[in-house]
Amino acid sequence: MPLLSSIVGLTGLLLWMGHTVGALRMPNTTLVQGRPKNTAVWPLSGLGVPRHRRKRHISARDMSALLDYHNHIRASVHPPAANMEYMVWDEQLARSAEAWATQCIWTHGPSQLMKYVGQNLSIHSGRFRSVVDLVRSWSEEKRHYSFPAPKDCTPHCPWLCSGPVCSHYTQMVWASSSRLGCAINTCSSINVWGNTWQQAVYLVCNYAIKGNWIGEAPYKAGKPCSACPPSYQGNCNSNMCFSGLKSNRLPWV
């Protein structure tokens, strides 16, 4: 598919180097051709998710920062979204992200989980001020993405990305991707497209329900909260469908 080929293989364009930070973002290869049945079901049990955690790979402060940043981006989409769901933290997704981050493998995975979960990756070397610095490049893809006009979705919507990649941003603002779980791991050594990075900070963020379906727009354009799923019972918070749930995470220990 032209869409996939335009996203995968643009690795050389995704390197950003600053005075104190070197960063790479993985081209999002979780884009798929067709939505399978029962996409609302994402059975993480047995798919590389550890039953017991020895230590957490993300702090409460970083968790809140990532969640708040995602919801800020989701609430401020243009055109406005009629069905954007408020994003909450999900403990199972965080555990699955931990399991992958600790492998220190620079690719999307594990493969069996990718059928159910969306995933964005980032890796950095050097210092950074905030965990948000690790994901800001995802949201900055917005400047390359054009939301498809309803008249162009007949019925499949075109993919309108003028830059090297837009799929990190579209996963962030996918309306039904209302659950997020991330993990950060410092890899002593990791192979990044043939180069060895040492003491690299590896961020994995998993999303459910999985987004980035080819032929679909990230959300329905319209008056905020005017097309929320029935389960939200008409509740709205900051231009997003809101259930009152902030997080399903376990007590922080």
Curated annotation (Swiss-Prot):
Residue ranges of domain SCP in the record: 67-207
InterPro entries from the UniProt entry: CAP_dom (IPR014044), CAP_sf (IPR035940), CRISP-related (IPR001283), R3HDML_CAP (IPR047899)
Record flagged with keyword Membrane: no
GO cellular component terms listed in the entry, alphabetical order: extracellular region
Main subcellular localisation: secreted
Top-level lineage group: Eukaryota
Pfam families referenced in this protein's UniProt entry, alphabetically: CAP (PF00188)
Signal peptide as annotated in the record: 1-23
Cysteine pairings via disulfide bonds: none
Cell compartments where the protein resides: Secreted
GO molecular function: peptidase inhibitor activity
Glycan-bearing residues: N28, N120
Keywords: Glycoprotein, Protease inhibitor, Secreted, Signal
Residue numbers covered by the propeptide annotation in the UniProt entry: 24-56
Job description of the protein: Putative serine protease inhibitor.
PANTHER family noted in UniProt: CYSTEINE-RICH SECRETORY PROTEIN-RELATED
Family: Belongs to the CRISP family.
Name the record gives this protein: Peptidase inhibitor R3HDML
